[in-house]
Design a protein with these regions (language model features):
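C-terminal motif of bacterial Sec signal peptides marking the signal peptidase cleavage site
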Residues: 17-21
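Extended ligand-binding regions for polar small-molecule ligands
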Residues: 23-25, 74-83, 148-149, 153-154, ...
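Ligand-binding clefts/hinges and TM-proximal coupling segments of bilobed small-molecule sensing domains
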Residues: 24-31, 36-40, 87, 162-182, ...
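Periplasmic-binding protein-like
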Residues: 55, 131-138, 206, 214-251, ...
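Bilobed "Venus flytrap"/periplasmic-binding protein-like clamshell domains
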Residues: 55-58, 69-82, 114, 135-188, ...
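Short helix-initiation/N-cap motifs at beta->coil->alpha
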Residues: 74-75, 89-100, 181-196, 232
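Acidic, polar ligand-binding/catalytic clefts
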Residues: 78, 87-149
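A ligand-binding cleft/hinge motif common to bilobed small-molecule-binding domains
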Residues: 97-100, 113-122, 166-169, 195-196, ...
Length: 285
């Protein structure tokens, strides 16, 4: 009886192992059965591209009125996936956690107005595709017309953003004139603070500034100062060393630039200055 019980237990354990193995293959939820992003894109034609993005960074990635994730970068990613028979997974992330998401391979790349300048050695990069600059937005009735008007003012900036890096780096002398420089999680919050008077100015990307201002009920209530804080370029960031996936995406982007698809997609966001900011095919890294 004891031997029979042992035999039954062994048989049950073996069956459980087989079933678990089958289940993990179908669901893709088991770590042991999960291929790295680098391996899967090379080996499988019908795989997925998981794009990490900040869902409050228009016009590059954001949620529209119908609740769908849209934006210029996501449109580019969708076209890349369509041409490679991949499924696009749009994965919103906390911008502060982007490196952890990428290094753990829960996402395959960061594609969302991602500045490459100063980070060249931290990721494997695509070629740049957007020339960007950091600017300051104020209320039109604020009396602030240039950087000197920011003295003693409350300025907000997104955490871990290029504007923050500039104000803590090359433009630290400018930031020293502010009453304070407060960090917020996303720019929707910053604009609500600007509307209410909780802050006097916002330092941010020009594309996002154009979108936020033009989408307000009264866009004339805001203005963008003429002088820029800094300039930079956007590129797609992959995990360091993932050159195989980067090369495949880059090849497809180059084809899209050559046949006019990138320009066509950019025209959808003409109100936010995207066509004029394109540099893909014009610059080489």
């Amino acid at each position: 009886m004891k031997k029979r019980l042992v035999l039954l237990l062994v048989t049950a354990m073996a069956a459980t192992t087989v079933l678990a193995g089958c289940g993990s293959k179908d669901s893709g939820s088991s770590d042991s059965g999960k291929k790295s992003a680098k391996e899967s894109k090379v080996e499988n034609d019908d795989d997925t591209l998981i794009v990490g993005f900040d869902a409050s960074f228009p016009p590059y990635g954001y949620k529209d009125d119908s609740g769908e994730y849209v934006g210029f970068d996501l449109d580019l990613a969708q076209e890349v996936c369509d041409r490679n028979d991949w499924k696009l997974v749009k994965q919103p992330i906390d911008w502060d956690s982007k490196d952890g998401e990428l290094n753990s391979e829960t996402i395959d790349c960061i594609w969302n107005g991602f500045t490459m300048n100063g980070r060249e050695d931290d990721y494997t990069w695509s070629d740049p595709y957007i020339d960007n600059k950091q600017v300051v937005v104020v209320r039109s009735d604020s009396g602030i017309d240039d950087f000197s008007g920011l003295k003693g003012k409350h300025v907000e900036v997104q955490t871990d953003s290029s504007a923050l890096a500039a104000l803590e780096g090359d433009q630290k002398d400018l930031a020293a004139t502010f009453a304070d420089l407060n960090q917020v999680a996303e720019y929707n919050t910053a604009f609500m603070d600007l509307e209410s008077g909780a802050c006097d100015a916002i330092a941010m990307d020009i594309g996002v500034a154009n979108y936020q201002v033009n989408s307000r009920k009264n866009p004339d209530d805001y203005k963008i100062l003429d002088k820029e804080i800094s300039s930079e370029q956007y590129a797609v960031g992959f995990k360091k060393g993932n050159t195989e996936l980067k090369d495949k995406v880059q090849k497809t982007l180059d084809e899209m630039a050559e046949d006019g698809t990138v320009d066509k997609i950019a025209e959808k966001y003409a109100d936010y200055g995207v066509p004029g900011a394109l540099c893909i095919g014009k610059n080489s890294k």
